[in-house]
Amino acid sequence: MVFFMLIIDVNHGALTLAEEYLNLGYEVDVWDIYQKIKKSEDFKVKYQKLKEKFGNKLNLFFEQPNFEKYDRVIAPIHCPIDVDFIPFTDAVSKILKEKFGNIHKKIINVTGVKGKTTTTSLINHILKDKYSTYLHNSNFGSIAPPTILKVLNSLDIDKYDFFIFETSLGLIKCKYGAITNVLENYKIAGGRKDALTAKFSSLKNAELSFINKRDINRYDLNINHKCLNVVDVDRAKILDKYPLKFKYFDEIFEFSKNIFGLHFVENSLFAIEICKNLVDMEEIRYRLKTFTIKNRMEIKEINKKILVKNINPGLDVKAISYAIKDFLEVFGGDIYIGGDFGIVCEEIDVKKLSEVLKRFNCRYIFVGEIGKELLNYLNGGYIKSYDENKIKRDSLVILREKIK
């Protein structure tokens, strides 16, 4: 019997899933609920190639089809539809089993709201000396669950001991699965579901699951999982803010001077709890201290003062807010902020940025064209250009300009 299925949401990987099911002999309709194929040349080309290959076995809809004619409906967990459906995480898990057998025993999967990318990067860094690992997180592209299929299809899977994935819509079938946090519970699927239920319902896909004790307390959770590990992030005691050093139970961990930001403590606890099943604690301590992040943030010392520089043509308001928060938590001091207009196509919203800056109690020194515009909304000093040798205190420099 040939199943007739509907897969919804091109933006989150419907075409990738469609290709897998078509190759398995299914007939597939795709509902492009957000009209992405009309807006994206990449999606359009991908659909056209699939259509040429599979012909009438694949059809595309931009309006809601009749759900009753389908044997299965597959969609992201947050999809706003009034019909029972299989979440993408479960569909991907089933295909993995069908194509690759027990590959889930090699998979480490991290989801949540914040900290996913850092946690997966840390896990990879801790394990990669002892094991052959493959990392895919948001630094490398889409983290929608169907992307995992695309990644594994491109690899010789026998070469790797572990695959480490960051996902956005819950956990796929995996050996180790972590939900770093759910910072707020809000309605999804057009108000039909909530984010909390969606995230934690995917815990069933993890053989060993890891969740944040703060979430249990915040939402009064009662989770039934035979191998549930509760990460008590509040057991971590910060010993030094920079270089970041902390005590967790009876172990002391330290990061290098290239890392700053107190959020690294919470992220590292999930990496520690997962990796202690695979390497000894001494190895984890050593690897943590050698961890670095490839980004445009530079930290250095000038005349016994700490200078944190973030010079980036694409800096947005959210990234600026996080950078200031991290800096003030660790160092305090002056904030140099500004730069130039016309660096990238998408200009920064100066008024919106000023509203974010008003939340922080600190001294601003505005720089360049953007800085001059900010003076219309905020009090602060002003300089036309910035000279790092003239800083008077620990300083954070956030400039939206070309990287030299």
Swiss-Prot record:
GO terms for molecular function: acid-amino acid ligase activity; ATP binding. It catalyses: 15,17(3)-seco-F430-17(3)-acid + ATP = coenzyme F430 + ADP + phosphate. ATP binds at G112, V113, K114, G115, K116, T117. The keyword Ligase applies. Pfam families: Mur_ligase_M. The keyword Ligase applies. Coiled coil: none annotated. Its EC number is 6.4.1.9. InterPro entries: Mur-like_cat_sf, Mur_ligase_cen, MurCDEF_CellWall_CoF430Synth. Keywords: ATP-binding, Ligase, Methanogenesis, Nucleotide-binding. One of its GO terms (biological process) is methanogenesis. Involved in the biosynthesis of the unique nickel-containing tetrapyrrole coenzyme F430, the prosthetic group of methyl-coenzyme M reductase (MCR), which plays a key role in methanogenesis and anaerobic methane oxidation. Catalyzes the activation the g-propionate side chain of 15,17(3)-seco-F430-17(3)-acid (seco-F430) for intramolecular C-C bond formation to yield the carbocyclic F ring of coenzyme F430. Belongs to the MurCDEF family. This is Coenzyme F(430) synthetase. It comes from Methanocaldococcus jannaschii (strain ATCC 43067 / DSM 2661 / JAL-1 / JCM 10045 / NBRC 100440) (Methanococcus jannaschii).
